[in-house]
């Protein structure tokens, strides 16, 4: 199939709709200048995300006591650092959700966004599937209208498992009422989005 022959495009966010490398570089400069006290928390938070993914891939279930993997990641970080989870959440939301917005818009993948708009204009169905909260970032990109469905960790309709588990993409297809075989997953990580797509019996396009 060519891209236009799919009924739905299911799209990753971070590193896919914008160039993550440049956003991270800009945020690293901001952290050094204005947020040194947050660096330890953010480093541990990112470590816990990859640790959770590795545990999940090894067949160990993520803790079911949390509302979402995102909530579990916050709790694990707080436990490791010996601080209240509310402190961790405040730092994470400020430095990973809110402040990057101004840079995300500048480094948007404009060609891909134009393709998405064209696909939707032709009647295609679209979903955003993310391992992190997405609402603020899609507003920064100005692309909310592009997506029929948003499936984001830590938000309503969010998955209970992280990629490469296919749950998020399968849930998006279900909400769109499109069969998995008619879906194209678009993402920047073959080891996460690609593996999830293959497990869901969907096609995959690496950006």
Predicted regions and their residues:
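Short glycine/proline-centered loop/turn elements that form peptide/ligand docking sites
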Residues: 17, 86, 113-114, 169, ...
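A metal-dependent, Asp-based hydrolase signature
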Residues: 48-97
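Short, acidic loop-to-helix structural element flanking the phosphoryl-transfer center
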Residues: 85-90, 94-127
């Amino acid at each position: 199939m060519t891209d236009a022959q799919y009924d739905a495009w299911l799209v990753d966010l971070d590193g896919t709709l914008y160039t993550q490398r440049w956003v991270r570089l800009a945020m690293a400069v901001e952290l050094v200048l204005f947020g040194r006290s947050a660096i330890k928390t953010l480093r541990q938070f990112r470590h816990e995300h990859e640790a959770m993914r590795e545990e999940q891939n090894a067949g160990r279930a993520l803790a079911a006591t949390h509302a979402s993997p995102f909530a579990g990641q916050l709790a694990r970080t707080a436990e490791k650092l010996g601080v209240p989870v509310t402190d961790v959440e405040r730092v994470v939301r400020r430095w990973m959700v809110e402040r990057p917005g101004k840079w995300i818009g500048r480094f948007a993948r404009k060609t891909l966004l134009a393709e998405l708009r064209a696909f939707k204009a032709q009647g295609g169905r679209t979903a955003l599937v993310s391992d992190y909260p997405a609402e603020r970032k899609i507003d920064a990109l100005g692309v909310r209208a592009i997506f029929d469905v948003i499936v984001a960790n830590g938000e309503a309709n969010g998955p209970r498992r992280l990629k490469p588990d296919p749950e998020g993409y399968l849930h998006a297809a279900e909400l769109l009422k499109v069969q998995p075989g008619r879906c194209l997953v678009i993402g920047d990580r073959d080891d996460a989005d690609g593996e999830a797509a293959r497990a869901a019996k969907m096609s995959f396009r690496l950006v």
